[in-house]
Every structure is written in structure tokens, then in C-alpha cells.
Amino acid sequence: MEKSKDELLAGIKTLERVEPFPDEVFYKVFEIEDNVERQKYIEALRNAAREIKRISEFNNLFKQFQLDYIQRMKQSGNKTRFTDQPVELTCGEWNADDMGVRCTRYDKQFQPMQVLACSHPILPVEILKNVDTSEERITLAYYKSAAWQQITVNRSVCANTNKIVDVLSQYGIEVTSDNAKSMVRYISDCVGMNPVVLNPKRSINRLGWMGREFMPYVTDVVYDGGKDFDPVFQNIRHEGSFEAWRTHCADLRKNKIVRMAFAASFASVLIEPLNALPFVFHLWSGESGTAKTVTIMAAMSIWGNPKMGGLVKTMNTTKVGIVRNAAFLYSLPFAGDELQTLKDKWVTNFDQLIYQITEGIDKMRGRANGGVDETKTWRNSFLFTGEEPITKANSRGGSKNRVIEIEVEERLVADGNCTVSVLTENYGHAGEKLIHYLQEVDLQVIRDEYKGYFDAMCHLDTTEKQAMAMSCLLVADRILVEQIFKDEQPFGIEDVKEYLRSAAEVDVAERAYQMVLNWIARNPVRFEDPKAAESLNKGEVWGKILQNEDQPGQSPVAVINKDVLCDYLEQAGFDYAAVSKKWAKKNRLERNSQEKYIHNTKVYGIKANYIKLIMEPNRDPNGFVSVDDMEDEEQMSLPFD
């Protein structure tokens, strides 16, 4: 039979020195809810213990019982009891119901205190572990405005009292500097006590390949991308009829350039399996109405809804925007319309853009609070349209190397409006089929096919990077024909070699040399003696042209003031030190007596440092080429002949 307080108190006074204090004495203390009554009872017990001269023993035992009680309270199996809660969790000492989240704590005097973690229902419902970085994020469900809502944040947010206030308060969660510590503890307790329910799930914040899996065509990986990329992610799906899409696109693909665009789009997902490099596929035309945009939309309809603002982006953006979208797409193609809108941002050419996106890695960025952000990477193709070429005459060889550039001279799609209507109603089926094919096929077979194309094209007058990109397109076209457009025949090298750049087109030194020759031809007066009677040169002297009249077949030599030549090359986007070495290898520069290329000599009485550039053999001192010296195939027929 349970004893009353008075009976327990009386029992203490009759205890012998060898008898222990009954446990019931201490348990009775914890049963008293009223703070005043509890303290009165404790003081009465202490007085009784003092009378029998065992006060120290009582105080020590009472302190240990207090600690034991607090520990058992923390380990208690309370459950969350929110109405319509997404999941039920064990929450330990916390009382979690529709009135909020709170618990009872005790001060040094063992006085109970109500500690509030949150004034409304809240609990963790999911933990996501990124497959790329192994970093975790946590999803919190909270009840506000008469509805359950969810937010996913980094685990570090829920482990730091400052961060949890800054981040969660923005979403209406009632967390302040006063209850932040308790909120952190509550969330931590819920996670620690529910390892099965809150077992981390695999997640990813981008699209594309994850080993042999491909996002979004995988079921056991949770998408955890930012809201900024929702317009892209939500449009990567299938809609409408696959047959309607295939029939219409098969008709479009009768145009070789349109078919090349389809291959460039699908080749994007082959770049990583083939260990190739990102490349740019650019369609341009000085005339509007050639259906360049519709062509890119058709190519992107392989993966989803190709509407503008979704899978096809305007290029009226920033460098950071392009890089972030490329990193999000990762393996899927980046499609950008109207490239010329970037002209003001990249000044005279797009070399910087081309280099950055085809490197496949973003620059290292520091954090305001120390450390560095995760460095973004991507392995995809870039499909652009524009009103002008993406590379210029003064573009560096590396940028020309990485681009497959096609001028559109005729309309690509007969009825653009009809095509857009079909493509925005039927799309996305082919992408999933093609990815499943790549997941099942032996990739080594595809790699061998790619290497065969690559080796064959390397024997043509082109560069390795051009061959690499075009080989990807040929493999992609073969798979598209085999899996989707079965009535067609795959492209061969002969079908596409017209779009490959020659080695000379890519060679920066060769282009610089030709530009210097043209520059001399445009300015013959600057190479005349200003003191000559018939000279038209009334200004600067840039040099002179040396021609051996006794040996007319010998190449003329342009003696050019070094500073003038360097200034011209710099304005044209070339570096003298870089191109002069290649000129020397091709014996286009004369050496002095010390085997140097700089001649300290006089030109028309003016002593300075000069470069002696050997001009083409059949070019006269004024820069012209004799028609008689031209090969027959080089001559053009005249329209009035």
C-alpha cells in the first residue's frame, strides 16, 4: 500500500543509523506538481534527516535521484502527436502536440521550468544525402496558416543557433534567438532517436549521369535541386504521342542541318561515357526567318518540353547564369537562342565564353565565412543560334577548335508554326528510351565505334578536338537511327566532313600571318619612302618591301617596324610572341647575323628595331597575287563571262 507524505516523513524520523532511506521518499518528491508544496516537503525531509544527524547522506542521495530522474525523462519514449502529421517520431523528453514543442527542465534547485522549442507543430521528415558530395540536407515539415508545409535546408542550418534563426524565420517558422538553442536540440533528438524512419535517402541537385544511373530517369534518388532550376526540371518529362513526334521529326530530319542538331543534342549524354570534351554546336545566319530557333527546339524535344524559357534559354543572361545552368544540366544539352545578345558582355568575340563552357568546370569561388564553395562541373554539349558566327577572324585556335559552326543559307523548316505546335504537345519520349538503351548496351562497343570515327577523321585536314566533337555526333546519329528513326541511314564521315574546320582555319599563327599580309596590302603607302619624289606617304613610315628584281621568283620581304607590327597584332587579338615562334618554324622570318629575329637597321634613314617577314612567293610588293600564278580550280568564273 502506497504511503502518504506524512507517513514517509514520520518514517524517516524513526530510522536507525544503519537503515537506508526508503526510495519511496524521493519518488514522492517527483510526484508533487505544485512547486511550493514540493519545496515544503523537501525542506521537511531535510529537517527530519537533520534530526537524526544524517543530513549529508540525505542531500547526496537526493542529488543522485534528481540526476537519475532527469536522465530518465530525457530517455522517455514520448511520441509526436501532431494532427495529420506526415510521420510519427520518438521525441524523448519533448512534448510535441498541436500546441507546439516543449519540455520540462530543472534548475540547480530542482525547480521545473517549461522550455519552448517552437510554438507550432514542426518535425524533421526526411534526410537527403547527396550522391556527389555526401553532404546531407534535412526536410522539415511545419504547420502554419492551417496547412502542413515543407522546407529542405542544409544539416548545418539545424545545428547552428544563428543559422537556424536566419534561415527558418524567412519561411514563417517561429524561431528566435530565445528558442533557437531548444529548436536545435529538439531536431537533433528527433533525428538521433529515429534512425530507421529518418534513414538518409540518396539525393542529387543536378541532372545527368550518376555512374550508370541517369537523373531524372531513376526512381530511388530524390531530386534536391534549387527552385531556380524548377523551370528546367519540370519540363524534362514526356507528353503526348511518341509516334506523332517521331513522324513529324522524321520529316524535319530530311534537312541535313536539322539532323545534325538532333545528333548534337543526343551527343551531349555521350560525352561522359566516351570521355570526350564539351563542345559547341552553333547555327547562324545573317537573315531572320531561317527557323534556327525551331531547329534547336526540335533537337531539345528529345528530352522534354522545348518551349522558350524551359529547355531553350534566351542568351540575354550573365556568365554566371550560363555556368550554373550548365552545371545543373550536367549531361543534358544546354540550348541558347540569339547568341548575339551576349555581344556587349564579351566585347568583340565570344572566345572567353567558349573557353569557359567547354572546359567543363567552373572557377573556384570563396565563401564569405571562409573556405570555398563546391566547384561545379558539367559534361554536356551547347546548342546555340545567332545572327553571326560565334568565332571571328581573330579568335584563338582553342575556341575555333571547340566549335562546330554551320551557316544557315536556306530555311531549315518549312512551317515553323506547325512544328512548334507539334513539338510543344508531343515530346520527351525519345530521351528516356535512348538513356535506357545506353544503360543496357556494352559501352565499350560504343567507345570502339567512336575511336574508329576519331582515328579516321584525324587523317583528314582537321584537328583532334574537331574530330572528337564530330565523332560524338556520328555515334549519336547512328544510335538515333537505330533506336528511333529506323527508316534512315546513319551518317558517315563523308556526310559531315564539310562542317569540319581545316587545320589552317584553327591555326592562330597562320591566320595572323594572312591578316598581316592583308594589312600590308591595305597600307602600301606606309611602306614607301616619304622622301621620294612620287611618294604619297606624308605620314608614318611602318617599313619597306624588299624585292629582288633580278630574281622575280624569290619571295618579297616586308621589313616592318616591330612596335608597329606588335600594336597591329594586339589590336587584332593576336600575341606577337605566340605567333612569331610558329612563323619562325615555317621559315617566314629572317634572322640577323646573331641568329635573332629582331634587326636593328635603317629604313629610309630611320634606325629602329625591325622584323623581316617573308611574304608569299607569288604576292607582289603591293600585296596582290598574279592571276597567272593561280591554280585553275582557284579561279572563279565571272557572271558576265
Predicted regions span which residues?
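AAA+/SF3 P-loop NTPase mechanochemical coupling elements
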Residues: A327, R367-F384, S399
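P-loop NTPase catalytic core of nucleic-acid-dependent motor ATPases
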Residues: D220-M308
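DNA transaction DNA-binding modules
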Residues: I32-Q39, K63-T83, M193-L252, V445-D641
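Contiguous, well-ordered alpha-helical segments that form the cores/surfaces of helical PPI scaffolds
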Residues: I257-P273, F281-H282, T293-S301, V323-A326, ...
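AAA+/P-loop NTPase substrate/partner-engagement loops
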Residues: T295-V347
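Conserved catalytic/switch belt of AAA+ P-loop NTPases
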Residues: F350-R365
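Phosphate-sensing "switch" segment of ASCE/P-loop ATPases
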Residues: K376-S381, N394-D487
